């Protein structure tokens, strides 16, 4: 009799995806982050569901409903902080996952890479709308500033912004629709993740050397299931340390003040994971130019397969490209720091230089380093 794992129509799909999946024998811990992202998504959906049971999406009661969750609901405080800091863990894993794809040339799987970019945009939209829901000062002003950027679109901008707001300012209608979208988007993300995996399993995983590994595969279970569990334990350790010792470390103190349209906070800034894009936005004095740079800072990922000039797939044996890659990482960290600073000297000029460097490294220096390395191979 055939094993039910291999014959049952539903279990068979799971078997081919997570159990009998042929995986390269040499993939490193940088390949753990895909599964960690899946865990983060499940955690966010579950904690979010329990929060939604007690949250009210009305401007008059939203702030106090979050306070009620933390004070009166059984273990509400831990659910709330797991959800808030879980988002930070999600983005840490996301950035490492994308960085891994860049470093090891995984972007040559075009469909998987492009679905990944769509996923990145969707997760960012979800996180932004989630940040608005507690209806604190930074929630309200963050929503006002970021949605207002759409008014830079010629001709239809102002109409579009008012359509998104559901009125002439960020108000009850905005909060209600943001809650609705924040609830539905994680399920759309889950569907996209399935498509992402479907395309990945068409080609099989990449590996650190970038060389096809068809002749050297091992089953996913038990080797990589055990390896993923280790990564998961470290993720849980980090998340629980954050939640139980310093839950507000990554938040903004202004968000503990209820939203007040008549009082602007001294420094409006988004959550830490958007600061790099926010710094790029602010570094351009023109509104439309800033918005375009903001979108392009992430959309540029779609150009990377086209900009791949190297004869080798991975950066494992390409020291020049490695230097450019780590410069890019350092530049993104600089942009993240600048995004959280006030708009004054010397932060403005540092932000502008870091923004120019960001686009230059991707568009000029990466292909240039690859071309030089190709020529060095001839010697």
From Swiss-Prot:
The membrane topology of this protein is: Multi-pass membrane protein
Which cofactors must be present for this protein to function? heme b
Chain sites annotated for binding a ubiquinone:
201
The molecular function terms of the Gene Ontology recorded here are:
metal ion binding; ubiquinol-cytochrome-c reductase activity
Q: Which UniProt keywords apply?
A: Electron transport, Heme, Iron, Membrane, Metal-binding, Mitochondrion, Mitochondrion inner membrane, Respiratory chain, Transmembrane, Transmembrane helix, Transport, Ubiquinone
Kindly give the SUPFAM superfamilies that the UniProt entry links to this protein. Answer: a domain/subunit of cytochrome bc1 complex (Ubiquinol-cytochrome c reductase) (SSF81648), Transmembrane di-heme cytochromes (SSF81342)
What sections of the protein cross the membrane?
33-53, 77-98, 113-133, 178-198, 226-246, 288-308, 320-340, 347-367
| Cellular localization per UniProt | Mitochondrion inner membrane
Q: How is the cofactor bound?
A: Binds 2 heme b groups non-covalently.
Task: Write out the similarity annotation.
Answer: Belongs to the cytochrome b family.
**What binding partners and quaternary form does the record give?**
The cytochrome bc1 complex contains 11 subunits: 3 respiratory subunits (MT-CYB, CYC1 and UQCRFS1), 2 core proteins (UQCRC1 and UQCRC2) and 6 low-molecular weight proteins (UQCRH/QCR6, UQCRB/QCR7, UQCRQ/QCR8, UQCR10/QCR9, UQCR11/QCR10 and a cleavage product of UQCRFS1). This cytochrome bc1 complex then forms a dimer.
Quote the protein name from its UniProt record.
Cytochrome b
Say which species the protein is native to: Equus caballus
Which gene codes for it? MT-CYB
